[in-house]
């Protein structure tokens, strides 16, 4: 008897959760479409277009919010030409990885990698040593 009373509410809860998930995904895609990134050639793409060629095909949460893409975006939209850039860690190390304050680290590969590969097109940059094929004797 109690099960009969709870079942309709559980079904409604499942339906609402599925609707929330669907609406959230749709909103996220609309937000990513608003991130219009410019590269050194003057070409513009949104985050959905940039990440379409990646294995996951969709931008991860937080994509476009890191410092390097924001700094490059400002430079390219302000007629500036970046000469050099480096990222260093400041603050406490996150629990998920070891970071030392003041040390230089590469940009993250999942969020920034695809964005930076697009944005740096048209600049003379050194090859990314992390993307080189490993030497196998």
Give residue spans per PLM region.
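Catalytic cores of nucleic-acid editing and processing enzymes
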Residues: 1-137
């Amino acid at each position: 008897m109690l099960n009969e009373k709870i079942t309709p509410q559980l079904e409604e809860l499942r339906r609402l959760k599925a609707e929330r998930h669907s609406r959230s995904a749709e909103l996220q895609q609309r937000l990513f479409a608003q991130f219009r990134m410019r590269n050194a050639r003057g070409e513009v793409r949104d985050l959905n277009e940039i990440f379409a060629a990646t294995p996951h095909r969709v931008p991860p949460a937080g994509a476009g919010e890191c410092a390097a893409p924001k700094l490059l975006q400002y430079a390219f939209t302000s007629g500036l030409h970046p000469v050099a850039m480096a990222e260093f860690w400041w603050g406490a190390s996150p629990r998920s990885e070891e970071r030392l304050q003041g040390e230089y680290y590469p940009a993250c590969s999942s969020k920034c990698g695809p964005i930076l590969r697009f944005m740096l097109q048209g600049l003379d940059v050194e090859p990314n040593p992390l993307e080189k094929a490993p030497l196998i004797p």
